[in-house]
Amino acid sequence: MLYQILLRLFFLVSPERVHTLVFAALRAIAAFTPTRWLLNRLCAPTDPILGTEVFGVHFPAPLGLAAGFDKDGEGLKVWGPLGFGYAEVGTVTAIAQPGNPKPRLFRLPADRGLLNRMGFNNHGAAALAPRLATRTSTVPIGANIGKSKIVEPAFASSDYRVSARQVGPAADFLVVNVSSPNTPGLRDLQAIGELRKILSAVLEETTAPVLVKIAPDLSDADIDEIADLAVELGLAGIVATNTTISRAALKTTGVEDLGAGGVSGPPVAARSLEVLRRLYRRVGDRLVLISVGGIEDADDAWARIIAGASLLQGYTGFIYRGGFYAKRIHDGIAQRLRAGGFASLQDAVGSAT
């Protein structure tokens, strides 16, 4: 109730400004041992049934913070105490860039969603690398890498290679982002020929587990092709899905006037779940599947787990649900695991298929 009142106040300020202020407040809380300890006591998962190990990394709980919130890894001390089982920072690019002109982040309140065209604003992979190397995070940290805007698509593999070389050694896993709608031509890199070059280049540069993040707007045939390529190349997994360019069934008025961008939150949930189910049917346990897109509560999270997701991510749900977002979801997952007679989280993965 209190957070809903705060949310109304937040909505009086531009979304990007609120993000800056809230993120600064979270970092301030986590900077001091007593307040960080208190936050950890209130929010961090403690039930051992939530823990899982995938691609050689132990995760204390399955819900992580999705890429986009902590673009430059400035809040690495925050995410574990706030209840997340891990965090994916970025997207970072080989060349630092300011992103698209403001305004570039918009609320869709009637849909509990967001529309963004941030454009990979970040300080660069070289700036993130030392933060990862010296971190004291209590949870795994992955790094999401994208293409620098000024780099032509023909040279994309070399650009991704640079980022992988810089952040790969200190990241628990790498996610190759070829699915944001906000960098011109980026989604074209999901074509199998181009994607093969990029993923092969990244794999040559790092020993960290490598995953690829895909768009919800791909055709089913394209999803199958990418899944097969991921298995062939020996990727650790697939993150599904990024934001959607679809405006179908949005309830928020005036969305047409907001311009281009990707939509996140509940509007992408159905397609995200559909893509997850298709991927699991295609690859089974040969790849780790991380589901993201419209996960608001424990019911949503559980639906993704039994459909085949080993890990989950949230961002928009965190914005709309507040600081206990991760805790409530993890508590709900633990209750469902025990009620269903599962001995571990991994036992529940794909159990509905």
Curated annotation (Swiss-Prot):
Pathway terms, separated by semicolons: Pyrimidine metabolism; UMP biosynthesis via de novo pathway; orotate from (S)-dihydroorotate (quinone route): step 1/1
- SUPFAM superfamilies in the record: FMN-linked oxidoreductases (SSF51395)
> Gene3D superfamilies per the record?
Aldolase class I
The record lists substrate as bound by 71, 116-120, 177, 182, 242-243
The protein's annotated catalytic reaction(s) are: (S)-dihydroorotate + a quinone = orotate + a quinol
Location within or outside the cell: Cell membrane
Fetch the Pfam families from UniProt.
Answer: DHO_dh
Q: Which GO terms describe its cellular component?
A: cytoplasm; plasma membrane
State the annotated membrane topology for this chain: Peripheral membrane protein
GO biological process: one example? 'de novo' pyrimidine nucleobase biosynthetic process
What detail does the entry give on cofactor binding?
A: Binds 1 FMN per subunit.
The answer on whether this UniProt entry bears the keyword Flavoprotein reads yes
Q: Which CDD domains match?
A: DHOD_2_like
Instruction: Answer yes or no on keyword Oxidoreductase.
Output: yes
The record's GO molecular-function terms, alphabetically, read: dihydroorotate dehydrogenase (quinone) activity
Name the top EC class: oxidoreductase
Q: Which family does it belong to?
A: Belongs to the dihydroorotate dehydrogenase family. Type 2 subfamily.
Recorded protein name is Dihydroorotate dehydrogenase (quinone)
- To which species is this protein native? Mycobacteroides abscessus (strain ATCC 19977 / DSM 44196 / CCUG 20993 / CIP 104536 / JCM 13569 / NCTC 13031 / TMC 1543 / L948)
The organism's taxonomic lineage, starting at the top: Bacteria, Bacillati, Actinomycetota, Actinomycetes, Mycobacteriales
